[in-house]
Amino acid sequence: MTVVETTPQAGLSPQQLAMLFQYTVEAYKVFEKLAENLPNPMTRAMFAQFAVDEREDRDLIEMKAAAVGARGVRVTLGSDMIFSDILEGEMSYRESAEFLISRERTLQRKLREMIGIAPNADRNFLVYLEAVKRAHIVELERDLELIRIDQDWWKREDAEWRIVHGSPAV
């Protein structure tokens, strides 16, 4: 008879929750600003929904922290300088979309890794957060393709018309 020693799996650490919270707060700020500032109504709506998603994720992270007894999730508000570049128009729309896709993918990968070793009590939480990231990636990739067709896609106030009729001939 073989005996396998098992140790109870610990849940999410305060550091992991803090990392998720930090990412969520930063992403919320960027998505909210993009939703406020971009003239393209379709892209504006996409980023507004992303901001709602990040607020919901933040609330879930706070609830999870409370459930596991973590004492408040601290966050430093020094976000990436690249976010400033995006919001100030220092990056092209293509570069901005590529950066946002990369950032969402990075967190999605971290969440996938966490799901693989998480105890059952944390899996639903992590799967939910990972699916939100996956959905954001799909929509950002769609916008990136539209930017490749029209480099000023995020500026287009006539976005719906262009989707239906195509870009006018120059």
Where are these regions (language model features)?
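Iron-associated oxidoreductase/ferritin-like identity signal
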Residues: 1-170
